[in-house]
Amino acid sequence: MKKTSVRDIALEALIKLEQNQAYSNLLLKSVIKSNELSDQNRGLLTELVYGTLQNKIALDYMLKPFINKPQKVKPWVIQLLRLSLYQMEYLEKIPDRAAIHEAVEIAKIRGHKGIASFVNGVLRSIQREGVPSFDAIEDPVRRLATETSHPEWLVKEWADAYGFEAAEKICRIHLIPPKQTLRVNQMKADRAELLDQMAAEGIEVEKGDLAEDAVKLLKGTIAGTHFFQNGEVSIQDESSMLVARALDPKSDETVLDACAAPGGKSAHIAELMKNKGSVTSLDLHKHKVKLIKEAADRLGLTIIHAETMDARKAGETFENEQFDRILVDAPCSGFGVIRRKPDMKYTKKPDDSARLAEIQLSILREIAPLVKKGGTLVYSTCTMDRTENDEVIHAFIQEHPDFEPDLSLEKRLPEKVRPFVRDGRLQILPHYFGTDGFFICSMRKKG
């Protein structure tokens, strides 16, 4: 067996993720780039890494009865057992014997015969005896958390906020890989024509479920195609596309995107403005500001001005009442995108949301004076955590009586999401439409 077998590459990626706490989506991109893989093997690698990572707690629960002294087992061997068990329990297309054989071969090369024998023994025992049932866990929250590999505290938080049934739906949909969605650049393309052109070139696509400029990519990737390179489409989740619609920017207006990287929402705003007016896009990190500029260049958008700046100091640079509309797409816990970044389930802590809420509120406080009277302030996050969403907005409006909920938000959003809009706020949970979890709140400045 060659060192570069797909399973060995997957194991190497899992080891790096565990050691470096790297983002899974970024690491996987770099691993794919550095290994020459066929489309089929690229798909298998993605499946193995994401699947093993996404089901880590469940896999450890299944492995536990078969490992006598887990503290003595090397971390890479645990990763190998998880990877192999994932194939045995979750991937019907891979025969158990193939998964076990590959695991033993990898163990021989990476370790020695003793480790190979141990790996073989554990996996053969599982094959013979079967894994323990999750039904043995009496507490329903703990059972759900274990079966769907979420931290127990997080499942409890969702159950308290939305009810146990909704928490279960959130957890289960997180285990289903998301489809890639594209936003059509209406400055350069028409969605209906683009769908026909893509189909003619063998790209499997269909209309999006929510946004009028959305296209669902059913198979393959878009980044290397001329559609992407020529700026006809951008990669963006449908719930994220609703943010610019909520802001509702018009041509010739002055808009601020206070936390803009990597630039998808800034670009959408500029497209809706027909590339007329001004969009100032801020981000704290210089390398991320570069991404905003690159996105604008690719899409042919000249009204985006990207600057490196902490939004919490924006008042030092900009005038009061300078902007018609401001978007604060705030840094957040990101629980709405767990399907795309499964590793975050294991790295986040219960007090993260309270810490982030302070940052979010401080950004809103700094930005508030910059909105013109009668102007719009939209706050959004990709999380379902009420501490970062409703509680932040409640605190902000209490402190700033010159802002009020924008009750016209509902009319600006697609019909399907309107029933979920309350008091100028929209909370999308991932199971509603199969999109990322997202929170959007629109406020008007009185006067």
Swiss-Prot record:
Cross-referenced Pfam families: Methyltr_RsmB-F, NusB, RsmF-B_ferredox
Q: Which reaction does it catalyse?
A: cytidine(967) in 16S rRNA + S-adenosyl-L-methionine = 5-methylcytidine(967) in 16S rRNA + S-adenosyl-L-homocysteine + H(+)
Question: Any transmembrane segments, and where?
Answer: none
Q: What Enzyme Commission number(s) does the record list for this chain?
A: 2.1.1.176
Give the binding site residues for S-adenosyl-L-methionine.
259-265, 283, 310, 329
Provide the protein's localization: Cytoplasm
CDD domains named among the record's database cross-references: AdoMet_MTases, Methyltransferase_Sun
* Keywords assigned: Cytoplasm, Methyltransferase, Ribosome biogenesis, RNA-binding, rRNA processing, S-adenosyl-L-methionine, Transferase
Signal peptide feature range: none
Active site (UniProt): 382 (nucleophile)
In terms of InterPro entries, this protein maps to: MeTrfase_RsmB-F_NOP2_cat, MeTrfase_RsmB-F_NOP2_dom, NusB-like_sf, NusB_RsmB_TIM44, RCMT, rRNA_ssu_MeTfrase_B, RsmB-like_ferredoxin, RsmB-like_N
Query: Per the record, GO CC terms?
Result: cytoplasm
Gene Ontology process terms (BP): regulation of DNA-templated transcription; RNA methylation
Any one Gene Ontology MF annotation carried by this entry is: rRNA methyltransferase activity
Q: What does this protein do?
A: Specifically methylates the cytosine at position 967 (m5C967) of 16S rRNA.
- Family, similarity comment: Belongs to the class I-like SAM-binding methyltransferase superfamily. RsmB/NOP family.
Which PANTHER family is this protein grouped with? Answer: NOP2 YEAST -RELATED NOL1/NOP2/FMU SUN DOMAIN-CONTAINING, RIBOSOMAL RNA SMALL SUBUNIT METHYLTRANSFERASE B-RELATED
This chain belongs to which protein, by name?
Answer: Probable ribosomal RNA small subunit methyltransferase B
